[in-house]
């Protein structure tokens, strides 16, 4: 294009260089090239050939330059169009990418919105769960606070009961230190016993009846008859038999009349008797009649109770346990193996189960002298030494009694004797029935109740049992070594039957600080059995005291 433009310029220059020659020859100069379209034909005819050629060359050069410019412009436009098209393509690509990004962002927004909705739902559920959990926790905390308050109330009751037990223990220590062994305490009220004096046949009191003396056993009961016959003292056996009256023989534990009365009573009254005697029954137990206090028999001297009950002297326990007969063991609720273990001393495995103490502990509680060990060994082996010694002690106790003392025994004390023997028969019968019944009421306890008119009901079961022991130990504690084997430790504090090996648990040495607990247990069992036998059979109450017995029905 530049070459064409150069050629056109050269042609134009050549035309100009040639034009002055004819111009000088012509009259009128030629018009410019631009004016050719305006020049008329007549004027063109007047021009010369050179002028026409120059005008034509000029017009052609102009046209060529215009065409070149136009082509240049077209090329420039095309180039610009190409650039614009490239930009458009790039923008299209960018737009496509942006659209893809926009779609991705939309999808992401939808996903995030779904997550937000899910988060809202989860937050609502979490708040609902939190409110429900807070309510449940509030209820649980309130329940546990109530339980905690109940436990605190129970703990306060236990603390009060423990304080009462401590006061009772202090009272027991004071009473033991004061030496209250002289006041005799009976199972029934003294008024009932005084009214029984006229109805009881007057005969010499048996020293070994087990009521309140420190003798070694009831010589008038059939099981002790066999015991003395086997121990080689027939003289002592015949003496109380000849002294007994027909009424006395009717009240004996081996008579066929009395055991039929308790059988008619049945066992449903027995749980009531487990609650212990009533407060009216407790009142006369702690008071001895003036006649009893003025005429204490040899077995109720102040030396007897500390030696044989409180001090844990096991001489009477060992003699009585070691010389037990088969009938005695059978009434106590044992099999032949039970009898053999019970008669020969056995092992020390019983009292730890019934009371929770170890054999060494009980061995320390009941420490005996060498005479006690010797007497227990001879009685356990079936020799005649223990029985002869028992017979000698009983004969001395009967021969040393003055006529006035015998009259006292023939009156009030004989009623206690017959009453205790009938209670023994009842206890034997209950033990025979207990062996055939399931022991479902072993852990039955009386819940503590409050009553301003009755101090006993405000205490716990343990405090009531200790109170029952204390009210019964002053009248029954001195006769504990003389009671049959069915009374002593035949059931634990929880009602479980004792092992036949408990006889051997009374050997050993005891310190004064370790003595009271097994003695408390023994006297408590005796007291519960006596109250059980008296309360569960109204026939004994009607027959003896004329419906004046104040024990539990």
From Swiss-Prot:
Subcellular location: Cell junction, Adherens junction
Gene Ontology cellular component list: adherens junction
Name of the protein described by the UniProt record: Coiled-coil domain-containing protein 85A
Residue spans of biased composition, Gly residues class: 376-389
Organism expressing this protein natively: Homo sapiens
Assembly and oligomerization: May interact with ARVCF; CTNND1; CTNND2 and PKP4.
Bias-annotated ranges (Basic and acidic residues): 236-260, 391-403
Composition bias type Polar residues, residue spans: 439-455
Pfam families found in the cross-reference section: CCDC85 (PF10226)
Transferase listed as a keyword: no
Residues with the Asymmetric dimethylarginine modification: 541
Gene name in the database record: CCDC85A
Keyword vocabulary terms for this entry: Cell junction, Coiled coil, Methylation
Coiled coil region boundaries: 43-109, 137-169, 412-443
Cited function: May play a role in cell-cell adhesion and epithelium development through its interaction with proteins of the beta-catenin family.
Location of region: Disordered: 1-37, 203-414, 433-461, 491-518
Biased composition (Low complexity): 1-28, 209-220, 491-508
Similarity comment: Belongs to the CCDC85 family.
Keyword Iron-sulfur belongs to the record: no
């Amino acid at each position: 294009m530049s070459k064409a433009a150069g050629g056109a310029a050269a042609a134009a220059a050549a035309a100009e260089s040639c034009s002055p020659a004819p111009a000088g020859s012509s009259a009128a100069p030629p018009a410019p090239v631009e004016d050719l379209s305006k020049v008329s034909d007549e004027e063109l005819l007047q021009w010369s050939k050179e002028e026409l050629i120059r005008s034509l060359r000029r017009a052609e050069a102009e046209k060529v330059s215009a065409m070149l410019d136009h082509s240049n412009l077209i090329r420039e436009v095309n180039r610009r169009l190409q650039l614009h098209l490239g930009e458009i393509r790039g923008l299209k690509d960018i737009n496509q990418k942006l659209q893809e990004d926009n779609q991705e962002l939309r999808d992401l927004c939808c996903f995030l919105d779904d997550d937000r909705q899910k988060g809202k739902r989860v937050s609502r559920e979490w708040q609902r769960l939190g409110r429900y959990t807070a309510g449940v926790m509030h209820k649980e905390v309130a329940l546990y606070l109530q339980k905690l308050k109940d436990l605190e109330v129970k703990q306060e009751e236990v603390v009060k009961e423990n304080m009462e037990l401590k006061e009772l223990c202090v009272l027991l220590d004071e009473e033991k230190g004061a030496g209250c062994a002289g006041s005799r305490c009976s199972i029934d009220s003294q008024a009932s016993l005084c009214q029984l004096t006229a109805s009881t046949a007057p005969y010499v009191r048996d020293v070994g009846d087990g009521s309140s003396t420190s003798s070694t056993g009831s010589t008038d009961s059939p099981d002790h008859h066999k015991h003395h016959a086997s121990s080689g003292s027939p003289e002592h056996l015949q003496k109380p038999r000849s002294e007994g009256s027909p009424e006395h023989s009717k009240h004996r534990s081996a008579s066929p009349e009395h055991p039929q009365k308790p059988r008619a009573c049945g066992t449903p009254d027995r749980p009531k008797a487990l609650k212990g005697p009533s407060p009216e029954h407790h009142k006369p137990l702690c008071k001895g009649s003036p006649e009893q206090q003025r005429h204490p028999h040899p077995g109720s001297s102040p030396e007897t109770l500390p030696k044989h009950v409180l001090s844990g002297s096991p001489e009477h326990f060992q003699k009585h346990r070691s010389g037990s007969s088969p009938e005695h063991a059978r009434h106590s609720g044992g099999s032949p193996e039970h009898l053999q273990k019970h008669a020969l001393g056995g092992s020390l495995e019983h009292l730890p189960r019934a009371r929770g103490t170890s054999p060494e502990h009980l061995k320390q509680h009941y420490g005996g002298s060498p005479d006690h060990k010797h007497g227990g060994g001879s009685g356990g082996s079936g020799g005649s030494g223990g029985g002869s010694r028992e017979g000698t002690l009983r004969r001395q106790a009967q021969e040393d009694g003055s006529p006035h003392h015998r009259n006292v025994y023939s009156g009030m004390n004989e009623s206690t004797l017959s009453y205790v023997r009938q209670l023994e028969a009842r206890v034997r019968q209950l033990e025979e029935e207990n062996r055939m019944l399931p022991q479902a009421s072993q852990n039955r306890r009386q819940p503590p109740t409050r009553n301003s008119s009755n101090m006993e009901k405000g205490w716990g079961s343990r405090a009531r049992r200790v109170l029952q022991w204390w009210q019964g130990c002053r009248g029954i504690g001195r006769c504990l070594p003389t009671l049959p084997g069915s009374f002593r430790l035949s059931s634990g504090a929880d009602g479980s039957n004792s092992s036949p090996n408990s006889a051997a648990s009374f050997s050993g040495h005891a310190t004064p600080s370790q003595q009271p607990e097994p003695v408390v247990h023994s006297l408590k069992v005796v007291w519960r059995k006596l109250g059980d036998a008296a309360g569960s059979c109204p026939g004994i109450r009607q027959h003896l005291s004329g419906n004046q017995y104040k024990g539990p029905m």
